[in-house]
Curated annotation (Swiss-Prot):
It holds the Pfam family DHHA1. The gene is alaS. Keywords: Aminoacyl-tRNA synthetase, ATP-binding, Cytoplasm, Ligase, Metal-binding, Nucleotide-binding, Protein biosynthesis, RNA-binding, tRNA-binding, Zinc. This is Alanine--tRNA ligase. The lineage of its organism: Archaea, Thermoproteota, Thermoprotei, Desulfurococcales, Desulfurococcaceae. Binds 1 zinc ion per subunit. It is found in: Cytoplasm. It comes from Aeropyrum pernix (strain ATCC 700893 / DSM 11879 / JCM 9820 / NBRC 100138 / K1). The keyword Oxidoreductase does not apply.
Length: 900
């Protein structure tokens, strides 16, 4: 094509160009943005840019592949889809599974939060959500598709023929790419200062810092769809090109004035030089913009700061809609934590803009704006809005508690560091700016890093380990695991015929009480299903099997005692069938239940954990609100309806690509198997999941279903425990027995238990009212008889009174009421208890500001002995022998003299 290789005069980077005048590689920070002056196709929207890209590559032999969700359900080492190549990792890139097409083209919505603090400041260089358009080619040793020359040619033709860019303005800069354990050389394609694409040639695996060439060589490209739109629209910021009319809508709703166009175009020109994490770079940026626009620096700083906040709200609200639209539930862990981080940063930006518009209104605008591009936003709109509203409520609650949380932390350690700010945000949700304000008001200033939210996001990029089908932790001794891995795959008779109760096999190996056979009917622990138990007979000896584990492809049987057998011996196996059948029922109903939850609660309901045992089943699901009794009844009704319909249940082995294309990513409710073909379990017209477990053949066999408990085990996750089959009757009998015991306890005849309990509750409420009146009477009596004679010590009243009431909670309540009505009072109630003296002491708010009762009690103990303690506004003291109220009052007054 006539390209010449050069090296940048200033940037010292190698690049290829047709232009003899270029001395730099034409991307920032080597040159300023000048693409607004480049002749090209004009005015492409994001949707038009996407379609132009996909259509071009379709015409050039690529198969269009639909995008995946922004939450990486097929990956257990990553929460979010951060690039198009993530779609094909690790199964395709490892060579285990073929790609869905080869070559292919895709436009993948992606989310990256590592630079969230820079969004808006750089006028579009950084976004949290974006579309990565890409064409991929997977070159196998026996099938080469295309490599560097064809990749560069396709990029060149797209930019010149579709976008109409003059060929001499296109630059290919040499670079190097690494990520996800792979690496390779790359070209960055830039025009007019703007990088439009990256072309990566993935050919190495990174192992201990070394590069090993891999047989599968992958063309991994990434074209920024939003950047293509920005390039063709030539607006002062990418946000104008991406969001169009929404920019003015948000500006009006947030009360942000339109900026001086001279300022915005000056910012556009030099924004590529800006390093937002460098304070000096920021200062230079504002000064340069002010100089170019002919304004003063502070005015420019104010304009660009407000604009950056407006743009960050635009960006974040779209990201929130995409995350929740794909089913993420905001929480304190996993991808839910990242969704909450974006929500709370958006709320903080609204606060900094003094905008009172609810975040949910802005998210709704975004969802409706993008519905045509992302249909899931329409399908899940009710959930999206409800979840955002709830997050706003929770954030307001955090702000109400923030001062006490931070002050408690400052008492523990005098100053806060960045790690403390991150911990306060991580564990309590306190925004760093709020924590810093509170700390500064207490004389302990702390600087919040510009990239605070980026630091937090980086700590939550993905899970620490991969679960697969759930066979990663066997609990077996290491030497046994190593021994078991020597054997090939154990034939899984429990899959071939889950109803087989007995089986004859051959011993492959024995190590102490551990046995591996050529085949087995014993199910190993995994996939949330507990192992089988039973007996084996070999060489006329019977052994009880108490555990079964899968190690690699071998299945290890664990006996109660050492097994006397040799390889080749015949082994007879019998499982505890009633136990197995109960587990099969609980496992099958779990599949029915998760599908019911997605219908009743919403598509965001996702399995977060499960366990199936003989006694019961347990399912943890993601859901943003606590479950109600009505929710439980609906779930029970739906599940029991499916049971009554006697739907067929079966398994089938399906190629991974075909399974994902036909059934979506809900097949991975129980984990993501690292396998080429998936074992799918089908519940007729109801549910499809990849699953290793054993199941009944018909939902009618489940027999019945009852949820026995439900609770919120963590933010964003609810737990259901349930029984099926015979266990429903057992549970009903247990309830009857419990009811009978309650009836005996409250002395109620059979059938009258409810009325009797209601009567007792009414009596209890009356007793509480009587107790309240009694406490009020006590407070009034003390006020009338004693307050006037309280001692005064340096502006604090001290009073001690004998108390006939010995119940400690009642005494504490009396003191609380008394000191809340007399804020400068320290009051003590003295109780005689079995010849000893118990003293409860409380201080009103004003008195507590002057003295810590814990310190006061320590002084008293030094004089009279005893033990006790406390801090702040409450303390207690216990002394052997009799101590009068007058003496206690005198001791407290003397101690006060020492303290004040």
């Amino acid at each position: 094509m006539g390209f010449v290789r050069k090296e940048g005069a200033r940037c010292r980077e190698a690049f290829w160009t047709l232009n003899p005048e270029f001395s730099e590689p034409q991307d920032t920070p080597c040159v300023e943005y000048w693409f607004d002056k480049v002749k090209s196709v004009s005015g492409m929207s994001v949707g038009e840019a996407r379609e132009a890209f996909l259509s071009f590559f379709e015409k050039h032999g690529h198969t269009r592949v639909p995008p995946r969700p922004v939450v990486a359900r097929w990956r257990e080492d990553l929460y979010l889809t951060i690039a198009s190549i993530v779609v094909f990792q690790p199964h395709v890139t490892s060579g285990l599974v073929p790609p869905p097409a080869n070559p292919l083209v895709i436009s993948q919505p992606s989310i990256r939060l590592e630079d969230i603090d820079n969004v808006g400041i750089t006028i579009g260089r950084h976004l949290t959500s974006f579309e990565m358009a890409a064409h991929h080619a997977f070159n196998y040793p026996d099938r080469q598709v295309y490599w560097k020359e064809e990749t560069v040619r396709l990029a060149f033709e797209f930019f010149t023929q579709v976008l109409g860019i003059p060929p001499e303005l296109i630059v290919f800069k040499e670079s190097w790419w690494e990520g996800g354990g792979n690496a390779g050389p790359s070209f960055e394609v830039a025009v007019g200062g703007l990088e439009l694409a990256t072309l990566v040639f993935m050919k190495y695996r990174v192992v201990d810092g070394r590069y090993e060439e891999i047989p599968l060589k992958i063309v991994d490209t990434g074209y920024g769809v939003e950047r293509l739109a920005w390039f063709t629209q030539k607006t002062p910021t990418a946000f104008h090109a991406i969001y169009g009319s929404l920019v003015d809508d948000f500006r009006r709703m947030l009360g942000v004035e339109k900026p001086d166009e001279n300022v915005m175009w000056a910012a556009f020109r030099v924004a590529g030089f800006l390093d937002p994490e460098d304070p000096e770079s920021l200062r230079n940026y504002y000064q340069t913009v002010a100089s170019l626009a002919g304004g003063d620096v502070e005015t420019v700083r104010s304009i660009l700061t407000r604009e950056a906040r407006l743009y960050s709200v635009l960006d974040h609200t779209k990201t929130i809609a995409l995350m929740l639209g794909d089913g993420i539930v905001p929480s304190n862990s996993g991808e839910g934590y990242l969704a909450r981080l974006v929500v709370r940063r958006a709320l903080r930006q609204l606060s900094l803009l003094n905008a009172e518009v609810p975040l949910v209104d802005l998210v709704e605008r975004q969802a409706r704006f993008w519905m045509r591009d992302f249909p899931q936003l329409k399908e899940n709109l009710d959930y999206i809005l409800d979840a955002v509203s709830l997050e706003e409520e929770r954030f307001r609650d955090v702000l109400r508690k923030a001062r006490s949380i931070v002050e408690r932390e400052l008492k523990r350690k005098k100053r806060l560091g960045v790690d403390d700010l991150i911990r306060l945000y991580d564990s309590m949700g306190v925004p760093p700016e709020i924590a810093a304000e509170i700390a500064a008001s207490r004389g302990a200033p702390v600087e919040v890093p510009h990239n605070f939210y980026s630091l937090v996001a980086a700590r939550h990029r993905g899970p620490e380990k991969i679960r697969g089908y759930g066979f990663d932790e066997t609990g077996l001794p290491r030497d046994v695991e190593e021994w078991a891995r020597r054997f090939g795959e154990t034939r899984r008779v429990f899959h071939e015929d889950p109803y087989a109760k007995a089986w004859k096999a051959r011993v492959l190996g024995v190590k102490g009480r551990y046995l591996v056979a050529d085949s087995t009917i014993f199910y190993p622990t995994g996939g949330g299903q507990i192992h089988d138990t039973g007996v084996i007979r070999v060489n006329n000896q019977q052994y009880r099997i108490i555990d079964v584990q899968k190690v690699g492809d071998a299945i290890v049987h664990v006996a109660e005692r050492e097994i006397a057998a040799e390889p080749g011996d015949e082994v007879w196996m019998e499982i505890d069938w009633e136990r197995r059948y109960s587990i099969m029922r609980h496992h099958t109903v779990t599949h029915v239940l998760i599908a019911a939850a997605r219908r009743v609660l919403g598509r965001h309901a996702w399995q977060a954990g499960a366990e199936k045992t003989e006694e019961k089943g347990r399912l943890d699901i993601t859901h943003h609100r606590p479950l109600t009794r009505d929710d439980i009844e609906k779930l029970e009704n739906v599940v029991n309806q499916v049971i009554r319909e006697r739907r067929r249940v079966w398994e089938d082995m399906v190629d991974k690509n075909e399974a994902e294309e036909k059934y979506g990513f809900t097949i991975y409710q129980g984990g993501v198997p690292m396998e080429k073909r998936l074992r799918l379990v089908f519940v007729e017209d109801w549910d499809v999941e990849a699953c290793f477990g054993t199941h009944v053949r018909n939902t009618g066999e489940i027999g019945g279903f009852k949820i026995i408990s439900y609770s919120r085990i963590q933010d964003g996750v609810v737990r259901l425990e349930y029984v099926a089959g015979d266990r429903v009757a057992i549970y009903a009998r247990e309830l009857e027995e419990r009811l009978a015991r309650i009836g005996d306890a409250v002395k109620a005849p059979r059938g009258q238990e409810e009325a009797r309990v209601k009567g007792l509750i009414a009596s209890l409420e009356q007793a509480r009212e009587d107790l309240k009146r009694y406490r009020d009477y006590w407070v009034k009596t003390i006020e009338e008889a004693y307050i006037s004679r309280a001692r005064r010590v340096n502006g604090v009243k001290v009073l001690a009174v004998e108390s006939l009431e010995k119940d400690r909670r009642t005494v504490q309540e009396i003191l609380r009421k008394l000191t809340s009505r007399h804020e400068d009072l320290i009051a003590a109630l003295v109780v005689e208890n079995e010849g000893n003296t118990q003293v409860e002491i409380a201080a009103g708010p004003k008195a507590a500001e002057k003295v810590d009762l814990g310190a006061l009690v320590k002084i008293v103990i030094k004089k009279v002995g005893g033990r006790g303690g406390g801090r702040g506004s409450y303390a207690s003291l216990r002394v052997e022998g009799r101590l009068s109220a007058d003496k206690v009052e005198e001791l407290l007054a003397d101690a006060l003299e020492n303290v004040l």
